Amino acid sequence: MTSQSVAKKLNHCFSDQALFRTALTHRSFGTPNNERLEFLGDGVLDFVIAASLYHRFPDLPEGDLSRLRANLVRQETLHRLALELNIGAFLRLGEGELKSGGAQRPSILADALEALFGAIYLDAGFEASRAVIEKLFAPLLDDLKPGQFQKDAKTRLQEWLQGRKKALPRYHLLEATGAAHEQRFEIACEIESPALRTVGHGSSRRIAEQVAAEKALKELLA
């Protein structure tokens, strides 16, 4: 099996093989790497998913559409799709990153998938990238049930406290470890009344805050 199996699963044949190689090149390997392609692919992905949701759910308000999109483009979802494509087997990583398990790291795999979207956009244009993304995300889009979609934990916690005329929670960064693109965050969620403090961990501040908020909700509703 070669890296071309990834392109085949994406149903795209690269005219510019250098773009394909760069999309699979982590910054630890050297330059050029996939960081700029990941930036581009992130924007393409956001737009394609936003447009798909807009047309699929004509009656949903903006807030619900935003939450659905956030759920679809989050790191966990991209990581799962990258595993299905076996991207990790073909990543070009520096020796240290390779030894530390970088080929299985969720953030690296998610970034590489977005880089591939960016590479396809540059290689063949927007319609080609849109077709690849829509096909890859079709099962996830088909499974969406907006009527059952739940607001994120921070929003639900805020609404629970507001409904009881309580002060809003405060989120504090306790610790951030790791290199810039591989950081782990520890966030505390503190509630004044009823007195409660929970801690969440994640690969971004947003994820860590959501984890801490979810823990607080479980405590309050227990």
UniProtKB/Swiss-Prot annotation:
Residues at the catalytic site: 42, 114
Keywords for the protein's UniProt record, in alphabetical order: Cytoplasm, Endonuclease, Hydrolase, Magnesium, Metal-binding, mRNA processing, Nuclease, RNA-binding, rRNA processing, rRNA-binding, tRNA processing
E.C. number: 3.1.26.3
Domain RNase III: 3-125
GO terms for biological process, alphabetical: mRNA processing; regulation of gene expression; rRNA processing; tRNA processing
Domain named DRBM: residues: 152-222
Annotated Mg(2+) binding sites: 38, 111, 114
Protein name, UniProt field: Ribonuclease 3
Self-association state and partner proteins as the record states: Homodimer.
Cofactor(s) the record lists: Mg(2+)
Catalytic activity line of the entry: Endonucleolytic cleavage to 5'-phosphomonoester
Purpose: Digests double-stranded RNA. Involved in the processing of primary rRNA transcript to yield the immediate precursors to the large and small rRNAs (23S and 16S). Processes some mRNAs, and tRNAs when they are encoded in the rRNA operon. Processes pre-crRNA and tracrRNA of type II CRISPR loci if present in the organism.
Similarity annotation: Belongs to the ribonuclease III family.
Compartments (UniProt record): Cytoplasm
SUPFAM superfamilies in the cross-refs: dsRNA-binding domain-like, RNase III domain-like
GO MF term set: double-stranded RNA binding; metal ion binding; ribonuclease III activity; rRNA binding
Any one cellular-component term (Gene Ontology): cytoplasm
